[in-house]
A protein has these predicted regions:
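C-terminal transmembrane helical hairpin of 12-TM major facilitator-type secondary transporters
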Residues: 309-354
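Glycine-rich segments within core transmembrane alpha-helices of 12-TM secondary carriers
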Residues: 146-170, 193, 375-387
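A late C-terminal transmembrane helix in Major Facilitator Superfamily
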Residues: 365-397
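Helix-to-loop junctions at the C-terminal end of transmembrane segments
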Residues: 66-77, 294-307
Length: 478
């Protein structure tokens, strides 16, 4: 049984990394044009394109971070690696604000920006899967959906904070001030976020599941030598994880990364008539705020009706509502754009609210952080991080403004197929972990239920380390 105060601190410690990551994403996205003008030796659209290319660089290094830092978390502990990623992430973000402009540093300005993005990508590769694992292992079984959803509250909070700070600086600075020093200010806010994150993470012990695993064997150091091999033995679960990651994050980056530039494309197609750039930014902030408010409610619902049900609803919404949402967005009026983006956002948060509790349940404790980090980052880098790039290329090449809808439908189909193979983890212990409860009276009920289920499974000849699917099939027939 984990004390509620400890759980609250664990959630705060995990969420602060997400806030920092998405704060940087929001700031970099909003400041991309200015960064291109100041740091790149190119002009106009070429400088902007290069700036976005450097944004994509971070995705190329996320799998490397997942491969190295994920298994390291299974070896030395979740909280130690989370402290490391917090330092790297915040340090790289602050460093971007310190890069000299091209007029003073020449090509080295571009090189320094590249290196900062590499470090951000590497650290993020070890951050998110580990943070999901951290919260999932701390959370009581019957509240894991709600508490896991708070990790995504951190995501949307970070994006809103980054967008808001960038918009504030742009509003208060003249063009010359913005190009001289104003663009740097939002990046410096990552410094206090980093201090807070490291402090929170250093004050917590490791998760009960990891500590129990460590106590099981004096041969743990020897076992760690084959941990990466053992991790890849989980490839069926990693494929299910990858399918869910695609459905989730194609939608995520379609909304947060591509829609702002897509609205400008729609305006061009309509001969310059449509919402202003300022309203474009405001509409994104409104949608993020709406999603932020609803995410915990969906997480709470997933503890009542199951994760699979929520994920299935989100997948169906992508398939059925992709065209209606794009039709509203392409009308390009203030009300229609916000309505269309909110529809897309509601589809997104069916995944965002449930994935932090769903994905860790696919893997046993010994390889959980490693398998999750590797699968998550490989699939997000290969299929999701470039969503804006390939969607924009298809729209530009064909002139068809409905391409985002086609891609969202494909994402929904992938999600629907993946959820078919997803075991329901609602209210159950994580694979390889003891039951986690919040109160003593709950513990007595859990023990009674587990004894009854264990007797049924033993009678059916199901082994103790069998995956959920095998146990589910036996229990469903009884």
């Amino acid at each position: 049984m984990t004390h509620p105060d400890v759980i609250k601190r664990a959630i705060g410690a995990a969420a602060i990394g997400n806030i920092t990551e998405w704060y940087d994403f929001g700031v970099y996205s909003y400041m991309a044009l200015t960064i291109g003008d100041v740091i790149m030796p190119l002009e106009g659209s070429a400088a902007t394109l290069m700036t976005y290319a450097l944004m994509a660089v971070a995705f190329l290094f996320r799998p490397l971070g997942g491969i190295i830092l994920g298994p390291l978390s299974d070896r030395i502990g979740r909280n130690k690696v989370l402290a490391m990623t917090m330092i790297m992430m915040a340090g790289a973000t602050v460093a971007i604000g310190l890069i000299p402009d091209y007029a003073h540093a020449g090509i080295w300005a571009c090189v320094l920006l590249f290196l900062c993005r590499v470090l951000q990508g590497f650290s993020t590769g070890g951050e998110y899967g580990n943070a999901m694992t951290f919260i999932a292992e701390y959370a009581p079984d019957k509240k894991r959906g709600f508490l896991g959803s708070l990790l995504e509250v951190g995501t949307f909070t970070g994006y809103l904070l980054g967008a808001g700070m960038s918009a504030l600086v742009m509003a208060l600075c003249t063009t010359d001030q913005l190009h001289s020093w104003g663009w740097r200010l939002p990046f410096f806010l990552a410094l206090p976020l980093g201090f807070i994150g490291v402090y929170l993470r250093s004050k917590l012990g490791d998760t009960p599941a990891f500590e129990a695993l460590e106590a099981e064997s004096e041969q743990r150091e020897k076992d760690n030598k084959v941990s990466l091999k053992d991790t890849f033995k989980m490839w069926p679960a990693m494929l299910v994880c990858g399918g869910l990651v695609i459905a989730w994050n194609v939608t995520n980056y379609m909304l947060t990364a591509y829609m702002p530039s897509f609205l400008s494309t729609v305006t061009d197609h309509k001969g310059g008539q449509g919402i202003s750039d300022n309203m474009n930014n405001v509409s994104q902030i409104i949608v993020m705020a709406v999603c932020l408010a609803i995410i915990p409610l969906i997480g709470l619902a997933s503890d009542r009706i199951g994760r699979k049900t929520i994920v299935r609803i989100g997948s169906v919404m992508l398939i059925v509502l992709a065209f209606p949402s794009l039709m509203l967005i392409t009308r390009n009026t203030e009300g229609s754009v916000i309505a269309g983006l909110i529809i897309m956002g509601l589809s997104l948060i069916c995944f965002s609210a449930t994935m932090p509790s769903t994905l860790p349940s696919l893997f046993p404790t010994a390889v959980r952080a490693g398998a999750l980090s590797i699968a998550f980052n490989i699939f997000i880098s290969a299929f999701c991080g470039t969503t804006a790039l390939y969607t924009g290329a298809l729209v530009d090449a064909t002139g068809n403004l409905m391409w985002p809808a086609y891609i969202l439908i494909i994402a929904g189909v992938i999600g629907l197929v993946s959820v078919h193979f997803l075991p329901e983890s609602n209210g159950r212990p994580l694979w390889g972990s003891a039951p986690s409860v919040e109160h003593d009276h709950e513990a007595h009920g859990v023990v009674k239920d587990l004894h009854a289920e264990a007797d049924q499974l033993k009678a059916a000849g199901v082994r103790e380390d069998a995956p959920y699917e095998e146990a589910d099939e036996v229990l469903a027939k009884s």
